[in-house]
Amino acid sequence: MSIDPEIGSRHLLGTDGLAEQPNAMHQCVRIVITQDWANSVSGQLIAECLVNLLARQVGLVEELEIVSAAVPLLIHPIIKGVWQTLTEYLVAVGEWAVGMKVRTGDNSSPHEADHTIVIGGATTLDSAKTIACIADSWKAWVGELKNVPDDRPSPSLNPVGPFFAAALAAGEIFKRTWGLRRGRFLDNHAYSLWKNSMSSVWEELDAGPALNELHLPPFVLVGAGAVGNALVYVLTHLENRDMYPVLVDDDVYDKTNLNRCSLAGTEDLNQEKTAVLASRLEAVGIASFPFSGDLKRFVNDARAGMRADVAEEIGAGSYSMVVSCVDKGDGRQDIQGLHPQWLLGGSTFDLQAKTNVYAGEKDAVCLGCHNAREHQGEAMRGIERQLRAMSHQERASFLTEHGLEVAIVEEYINDSHCGHLGRAALMDFVSTPPPEFSVGFVSLGSGVLLAASLFRNLLSGETIPHASGMTTFNFLNGNLGEGSLARDPQCQICSKAAEYQDSISEL
């Protein structure tokens, strides 16, 4: 099966910091897994995630080759099937994701790879052309092979470090293939997501605690797109599966989603996003409640089939924990309007992955800050003025170029009235933003940061986080940092103006 090039359309748009055009296309990437790492859960998690991410770099990566001994599969598969060995499973992951053929073998093929990634250390390879990565619990390292720490895999089952290591390595392949105008390639970079710290010395960083005592309370996940996929991806590999996510999204998967939605494959096209995520969770023994609809519908829905205690709490208007993975102002405003006790958010921007904790303390930023609702009225008036200023021929050309039906829009422009099909078509056009750059490793990075933030708070014994905060990782330069957002004085939810309006309405 040939891979549909439309899958790569979003990451081929390019973004700030990258070269104007890719330096190379249709690259062959070889993944070498050393024996000790192939026989570890950490090594297998890195390998699975790497194949999943690299296969989705359609247009840039054309061929994957796995060099590994035939070791037993130790991790829970994310797709249905039975595999005896790790390499058999990795072949299936590439095929499932986008239809990519993955070659395997104990030794490298005669064909020279454009890029090589080593999971572990291999002194026989040309270190000048090779990236290496390792992970341990909450820690991840990526860099040039000559700098790889001399460390054997630990018995840790924690997916946080391995998934972050895979995202880092996939990001380095992307940057090296595309080329940079600014930023840097990572040559010796270690990270701990337990402490949100970075260093060039692997041993200095804290691997953090095990996750076997982690207990996730029921929570509502709003947004089952790329970042939501990444968070659920992490959850499917946890030891403790005693959790109950409520999944809310009104969308289905299209081809352009497959470059970054890590739990969706070609067989999931046109399927409800929440249903697909629920099926992935169910496959590893995690119960969930998928709701295909927007948040407003969810709040007013009877929620038939939801676990009784969770339905009772939500029915009373109480939201203990909500995770936001939506990318539009309206959705974020609606989520903040639930006034959850504990609110976290994950997002991406260009090559940056971000996560925020909103603790609700006095004068702190809320999810509604800097996320104003989109007002289509002015945009609608603007497009109407623009169209009426065109000649009939210019208008027809514009409408055809943007996929709008000329006849019904012409009828509306000449005789405007509400409810007309032409008006509906134009309203849909102005409310749909133009395609933006997105790529899988950034979305995966955001989901991992989100999971790490959630796990840290729970393991610290907090039922509600004591302070708001933001964690950002920039794949362009490898910087990991913590910070805070300033409150938006014009926020429609938490600003003084909003408080004043509420007090007036109560009189």
Across the structure, where does each feature detected by a protein language model lie?
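Adenine nucleotide-associated cytosolic modules
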Residues: 1-507
